[in-house]
A protein has these predicted regions:
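Conserved alpha/beta cores of soluble small-molecule-handling proteins
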Residues: 46-222, 226-229, 252, 256, ...
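Short, low-complexity interaction segments enriched in Ser/Thr/Pro/Gly
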Residues: 6-9, 23, 35, 42, ...
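Short hydrophobic alpha-helical segments enriched in small aliphatic residues
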Residues: 9, 15-16, 25, 30, ...
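Glycine- and Gly-Pro-enriched alpha-helical subdomains that act as flexible
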Residues: 222, 229-251
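Short, Lys/Arg-enriched N-terminal segments with co-localized hydrophobic residues
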Residues: 28-48
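Basic polycationic patches enriched in arginine
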Residues: 2-4, 13, 19, 37, ...
Length: 333
């Protein structure tokens, strides 16, 4: 098991061009941008759609929030996004989310037509306009409308969309008792093809693995990388505890470097819990004392089984509970 101690550096956001003039959305656009399936079997369920949806500087009701059917975000999943949480009306680590958004855009050659400062103000305004005290924010940047071909240089007017809404996470009993995982046959994207560090609108890789989990009766599934090492779950990062040592796969394993993941590593350091990034296998999870997942929507939740094998005592462990409690305090500071 290769390992290295945890270090994390936050880069500065890359600023785009000055903020656009927020043109009116063409009323002939035929696609309702923000329709959602009933996710009752998914990791979380949207309770009610946002009544004030932000698109390029303007607000629309959910029924009137539309983008072009020629938008490459729809046609090819060409765009980037961030999923964030609000606690007490304040977005948790918004700056870090925007840094990651800009890095995803830079990696895919997508120019965000605003600045990080302006977008910070827009996200906060959207949260306030929707009176969202506790909930979820989805921030999306599409490539914009173009031709039916792949050529991204024929696209113009990237769409910036922000939804602020309430969500229901996993059922309370899963937070109390932990959830079960299976290992998906679908492996994580090879970093040489598409970096998992890019939070792309194309989530088919994750969706296929998610379907495997759901068909097996599990709400989450573990994804391995092309080397057979543990990467992450379909929507969350994964941690294990062995003999008091906290371990999580490194970025090089092909993971999305989660904002919640990094917050938990920082908390562990503050609490005197030794934490490392280490290349892990399923054997390491099978033989771990504890296991838990982290994510903006999931927060911190224990995993008590993998592939029908109990992890540890088959219930949330002491370190998992300590970090969960510390995280819930952190997000409301």
């Amino acid at each position: 098991m290769r390992q290295r101690s945890f270090t994390h550096e936050v880069s500065q956001p890359h600023h785009g061009s000055s903020r656009s003039s927020s043109p009116h959305v063409n009323q002939t656009y035929a696609l309702t941008a923000l329709t959602h399936r009933n996710l009752t079997t998914q990791r979380f369920t949207f309770i009610a759609m946002s009544q004030h949806i932000y698109i390029n500087g303007e607000y629309f009701s959910k029924d009137d929030a539309k983008i072009s059917v020629y938008d490459h975000g729809l046609l090819y999943g060409d765009g980037v996004f961030e999923g964030m949480r609000a606690y007490g009306g304040k977005v948790f680590r918004l700056e870090q989310h925007l840094i990651r958004l800009w890095e995803s855009a830079l990696s895919t050659g997508l120019k965000i037509p605003t600045t990080s400062e302006a977008l910070t103000a827009d996200v906060n305004e959207c949260v306030k306009k929707n009176a969202l005290e506790e909930g979820y924010i989805r921030l999306i940047v599409t490539r914009g409308a173009g031709a039916l071909g792949l050529d991204p240089y024929k696209c113009d007017n990237p769409q910036i969309i922000c939804i602020a809404d309430k969500i229901t996470l996993y059922p309370d009993d899963l937070y109390q008792n932990g959830l079960e995982l299976i290992t998906a046959a679908t492996i994580r994207n090879h970093p040489a093809a598409l970096s998992p560090r890019v939070k792309s609108l194309n989530y088919l890789n994750n969706i296929l693995a998610k379907m495997e989990g759901l068909k097996a009766g599990c709400v989450e599934a573990l994804m391995l990388n092309h080397k057979g090492e543990v990467a992450e779950c379909t929507g969350d990062n994964i941690f294990i505890v062995k003999n008091g040592l906290l371990m999580t796969p490194p970025v090089e394993a092909g993971i999305l470097e989660g904002i919640t993941r990094n917050a938990v590593l920082e908390l562990a350091d503050e609490m005197g819990i030794e934490a490392i990034e280490a290349a892990l296998t399923r054997h390491d999870i099978y033989t771990a004392d504890e296991c838990f997942l982290t994510g903006s929507a999931a927060e911190v939740i224990a995993a008590v089984k993998l592939d029908d094998r109990e992890i540890g005592e088959g219930k949330p462990g002491a370190i998992t509970k300590q970090l969960n409690e510390a995280f819930r305090i952190l997000v409301r500071q």
